[in-house]
Amino acid sequence: VDAAVLEKLQAGFKKLEAATDCKSLLKKYLSKDIFDKLKGQKTSLGATLLDVIQSGVENLDSGVGIYAPDAEAYTLFAPLFDPIIEDYHVGFKQTDKHPNKDFGDVSSFVNVDPEGQYVISTRVRCGRSMEGYPFNPCLTEAQYKEMQQKVSSTLSSLEGELKGTYFPLTGMSKEVQQKLIDDHFLFKEGDRFLQAANACRYWPAGRGIYHNDNKTFLVWVNEEDHLRIISMQMGGDLGQVFRRLTSAVNEIEKRIPFSHHDRLGFLTFCPTNLGTTVRASVHIKLPKLAANRDKLEEVAGKYNLQVRGTRGEHTEAEGGIYDISNKRRMGLTEFQAVKEMQDGILQLIKMEKEM
């Protein structure tokens, strides 16, 4: 590892040590011992500990503070990743092994709000990384373009309900751009956390969006992850949304090999998304429960649900609408993760009705 990188690492470590009010998992677990053990290591693609921690060093208000520059980083820098993964994915110990992919009996998922009183929309997404390519910080412009080529040709072969159009961000017309913004489909260049992790290089090369004609199926290409596969619709029919997602993932998987790790499951850029990578969420109005956000958080916590503001992480609830999703992604199957979310949402609705 060259001297300039080591110097930056030392300075970064000092900055973390001095930041007494920093609550990130990076600060909690990057001890002097682990730092000294890892600072000289380099993956075969040339990624160092600096690539792993720089976002968390620059943004001391990070919740987690680390990213994986490539798949090998999860193994090479395991002394730092493993305890952070165990802490975030509560209950997934360093000796545990994530189960094999299992979507389970998809017919057992239901409409959680058949009367349409509470749930505004339902969304299930998963992330995938393409085998043989590193994650954002290590990708070249040529690789971005090559990946886009592979993905867009795979997506354009989808049929039936999944049939749609691929829109590259490069050279996108103002009209198309505005249309995608109005539909809330367009992703922007990364926030300061991703910027600091070097996840936005060569923007917008190789980035794009695919959506089906009904606008219920969406793929983000080379945003935070190589692929974000998303199924969504208005209302509370979780069953329909999940079935659409699983059929899409199965189709894409036939053509594109995904990065998978024996212990950690499907690999993603951010360790919070590992394992199933599945986030099942609803936009939901619970005026009585939500009158007291702490109470809502407490109940949600019992069902391993995460409560966010309307527009996702780091936002407020607009008009009392919350984004509520499964928190656990590791150490359980895709089926179990979505089932846990379904059970929790049904319970929240039941409590709201009884108040």
Swiss-Prot record:
<dbReference type="InterPro" id="IPR022414">
    <property type="entry name" value="ATP-guanido_PTrfase_cat"/>
</dbReference>
<keyword id="KW-0418">Kinase</keyword>
<dbReference type="Pfam" id="PF02807">
    <property type="entry name" value="ATP-gua_PtransN"/>
</dbReference>
<dbReference type="InterPro" id="IPR000749">
    <property type="entry name" value="ATP-guanido_PTrfase"/>
</dbReference>
<comment type="similarity">
    <text>Belongs to the ATP:guanido phosphotransferase family.</text>
</comment>
<keyword id="KW-0067">ATP-binding</keyword>
<feature type="binding site">
    <location>
        <position position="270"/>
    </location>
    <ligand>
        <name>L-arginine</name>
    </ligand>
</feature>
<dbReference type="InterPro" id="IPR022413">
    <property type="entry name" value="ATP-guanido_PTrfase_N"/>
</dbReference>
<keyword id="KW-0808">Transferase</keyword>
<dbReference type="InterPro" id="IPR022415">
    <property type="entry name" value="ATP-guanido_PTrfase_AS"/>
</dbReference>
<protein>
    <recommendedName>
        <fullName>Arginine kinase</fullName>
        <ecNumber>2.7.3.3</ecNumber>
    </recommendedName>
</protein>
<comment type="subunit">
    <text>Monomer.</text>
</comment>
<dbReference type="GO" id="GO:0004054">
    <property type="term" value="F:arginine kinase activity"/>
</dbReference>
<dbReference type="GO" id="GO:0005524">
    <property type="term" value="F:ATP binding"/>
</dbReference>
<feature type="domain" description="Phosphagen kinase N-terminal">
    <location>
        <begin position="8"/>
        <end position="90"/>
    </location>
</feature>
<keyword id="KW-0547">Nucleotide-binding</keyword>
<feature type="binding site">
    <location>
        <position position="313"/>
    </location>
    <ligand>
        <name>L-arginine</name>
    </ligand>
</feature>
<dbReference type="GO" id="GO:0046314">
    <property type="term" value="P:phosphocreatine biosynthetic process"/>
</dbReference>
<dbReference type="InterPro" id="IPR014746">
    <property type="entry name" value="Gln_synth/guanido_kin_cat_dom"/>
</dbReference>
<dbReference type="GO" id="GO:0005615">
    <property type="term" value="C:extracellular space"/>
</dbReference>
<feature type="binding site">
    <location>
        <begin position="63"/>
        <end position="67"/>
    </location>
    <ligand>
        <name>L-arginine</name>
    </ligand>
</feature>
<dbReference type="GO" id="GO:0004111">
    <property type="term" value="F:creatine kinase activity"/>
</dbReference>
<feature type="domain" description="Phosphagen kinase C-terminal">
    <location>
        <begin position="118"/>
        <end position="355"/>
    </location>
</feature>
<feature type="binding site">
    <location>
        <begin position="308"/>
        <end position="313"/>
    </location>
    <ligand>
        <name>ATP</name>
    </ligand>
</feature>
<feature type="binding site">
    <location>
        <begin position="121"/>
        <end position="125"/>
    </location>
    <ligand>
        <name>ATP</name>
    </ligand>
</feature>
<feature type="binding site">
    <location>
        <position position="228"/>
    </location>
    <ligand>
        <name>ATP</name>
    </ligand>
</feature>
<dbReference type="InterPro" id="IPR036802">
    <property type="entry name" value="ATP-guanido_PTrfase_N_sf"/>
</dbReference>
<feature type="binding site">
    <location>
        <position position="184"/>
    </location>
    <ligand>
        <name>ATP</name>
    </ligand>
</feature>
<feature type="binding site">
    <location>
        <position position="224"/>
    </location>
    <ligand>
        <name>L-arginine</name>
    </ligand>
</feature>
<dbReference type="Pfam" id="PF00217">
    <property type="entry name" value="ATP-gua_Ptrans"/>
</dbReference>
<feature type="binding site">
    <location>
        <begin position="279"/>
        <end position="283"/>
    </location>
    <ligand>
        <name>ATP</name>
    </ligand>
</feature>
